[in-house]
Amino acid sequence: MLKTLRKAEYVELVILFFIQAMAASAWTVSLGMVLDAHGLHAIKALAFAATAIAAFISPLIFGAMADRHVPPVRVLRWLALATALTMSLVSTAIKFHCNQWLILALLQLLALANAPLTGISSAIVLARLADSKEFAPIRLMMTLGWMAGCVLVSLLGVDTSALSGYAAATLWVILAAFTFFLPPLEVPKSAENLSWHERLGLDALTLLKNRDHRVIFFTTTLLNIPLSAFYPYAPTNLRNLGFTHASAWMALAQVSEVIAMASLGWLLGNWRLKWIFICGLIFGVLRFAFSAINTKTWLLIGVGLHGASYALVFVTAQIYLDQRVESSWRARAQALLTLMNNGVGYLIGYLGMGWWFAACVRPTGTQWSLFWGGLATIAAMVLIYFLAAYRGTGANSQNQSA
């Protein structure tokens, strides 16, 4: 396993995460508002569900490729370029008011290219660290990059414009160019004599046989169901309450994430993983409960808690897998996490939350307290499941601190 020994290597990993998150947020946070501004509100739920559908297909395939066939850095480069190209096509179709079904088809192609990126980049970074506990400070730069993308969109004044897609596409091209400065990891072992089951990465499903692995996968998946409503609908709620630069205000979510990420290294050294997960899940419940009060102050507090919940649950899950799964399965384990979270969780969430939002709309306006209150209830049920199911035991010495 390669180790991060030089400052130059550390800077490379930091830049990788920063640019990737900046590109992702510039598009993700503004997408819902762009669709609304161009008369495409009717397809919003399906547009976000495209990401979930893609997560069933491409992460495991490309994760297996990065484990066995092609150096992960090269996989990341070509996927970043494919993301930039398809994002430009989507933005052009929206700008010129093309048929909504063509726009949805292009969004699906974009999602297929984009879905594996976080898992692969995380596997690249983790493979170069001597200790997975070092991951949190580097992952912090992804949080700062996400904030930078939100602020960039608002500074450019393109919160509701298809131009936000062109800005994000440019950042993906920059990321692809930057990968040429990353030293490639060791070329994966030969793919000879592999079954199609293994070539498609489906053997990663065997990880679910382990009880604690299964609980972690299921917990993050279930939490993604209410979480999927955050970016499609929180900016709309902000604008309804009078916040004009919603994308910039959404960056408050990353303030608590910065604090949580900065604290995660210490927490991993002093707390059991179980208590870190529980703390993150509690923040998840409070995030929606405070939003349900539906005043400017409480909604902003709810938005702010999003980041702490995300870091303590989802980033800890990535570190958990790196500690508890053999290194030869690293990319596939992260890919399976992407499939479960962004696939199963988000697909149920985007479609279900689209229905739930419609059910909360009245002739007098959206019943935001009812909407967010329902999501707080779901998050509380996820917390109860984790408390009842997680044991924190496993097969190797690293499990003792879980």
Report residues per predicted region:
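Hydrophobic core of transmembrane alpha-helices in multi-pass small-molecule transporters
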Residues: 18, 86, 99-119, 221, ...
